[in-house]
Amino acid sequence: VLMLDDIPVEEVLTPRSVIFFLNKESSVKEVLEKHNNIEFSRIPVCDNGLDNIVGVVRRHILLKSKAEDQFDIKIGELARPIHTVQEADSVGDVLDEFVKRREHMFMVKDEFGQVTGLITLEDAIETLLGVEIVDETDSVVDMRKLALDNWRKKRWKTQE
């Protein structure tokens, strides 16, 4: 039996190095011109980088704004607040928090208040089931593996 209370969030989070985020000052037009096919349904919104998270925007809100010709709206105006958990919190506690708050994504911080990643409801359920949930829109199956691969490539280049 898998004990979710024994697994810390830091073991299952999506690392900050592979988080796709948007700047709060960008307009809907700028975002959609630069990223014409956003694959994530929920996107963190920041003010000058990941250490200053201001909220989360849902992809469908961006597309709705586009459909309503609201191209000049700033992403920060569309963002909703996002809850933060600690990387030492258990996946079990965070799963309970997802259910209680009716949310699907939380930012994760370390003991110093630095953003270390994010965790989704899907991450918690995958941990419970012990398998990756992959749907037709996933271009990357495992974001933790992607972060590790990127780190290895960068390290290899610096050693050359």
Functional labels for PLM-detected ranges:
Residues 1-160:
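Cytosolic regulatory modules rich in charged/polar residues
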